[in-house]
Amino acid sequence: MQCMICQSGMQYFFSKTFTQFDLDQVDYWKCSACGFAASKTHLDMSDERWARLNNDFHSQTHYTEDNPYNRNQRYFNQALMLSLMRKQDLIPAGDWLDWGCGVGAVARLLRDYFDLRLDTYDKYFTPEVNAVTASALKPCGHQLVLNTAVFEHVRDRATLNEIESYVKPDSGCLAVHTLVPENVPANPDWMYLLPVHCAFHTNRSMQLLMDQWGYRCSVYNEHAKLWVMFREAPAAIEPKVAALNKAMGWQYLHFKPGFMDYWK
């Protein structure tokens, strides 16, 4: 199997046995070059089985009040982070898009509490606010493309490239929420191995994606658990980050040229 990030070969890593959602043994493979790991079992599924797995999992976990995967505090912190970055002129005004938005929780918070519009698109859910159809998406047309809890569900490079393709090529920003460790652990009990998670990035694989897509620096906030990547030069972004951090009175945004590898 070939790595979707760097095209190097991947080798068998470890297996985990599930007892729900029509899953049994799941085999995870790892790229020796960039550390990216993926479930070969999930990547080999038919589109129909993959859609059924996602529907079954999210129908059981997404809407219940005691849902352990429902991150309402994170959604609010993401909306807050984006609004503060807009105020600091780190993210330009214009069309904003949440690709793979679920029901549109971040967009609703931005609308209700920060007077900002975030358009929403999802292949599997019906967003509650600002929904746009696939035909209305604007290639190279958005100043911000956000995706939260999406990268770990992506089974092919074409989908990653599609998400990024909606960012304006000069001044647009890409915001990504996923878990990015230094190394993916060879541990079947690792908490991120959910039945619908099939792709696991590392600091190295994310740096390669930034290089391939032309992003030059990034910031991270640990409460929002969100990265925002910029095509502008680090020298143009860093003073604005410093100004926001000074106003907040603490290191609200962590900045770095290249990928902000916060989780070592």
Please give the residue ranges for each predicted region.
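Short, glycine-/aromatic-enriched active-site segment of Class I SAM-dependent methyltransferases
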Residues: 176-199, 204-211
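Rossmann-like AdoMet/SAM-dependent catalytic core
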Residues: 5, 203-264
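Short glycine-dipeptide loop
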Residues: 167-174
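Histidine-centered divalent metal-coordination motifs
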Residues: 149, 153, 197
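A generic structural signal for well-ordered alpha-helical segments
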Residues: 110-111, 167, 210
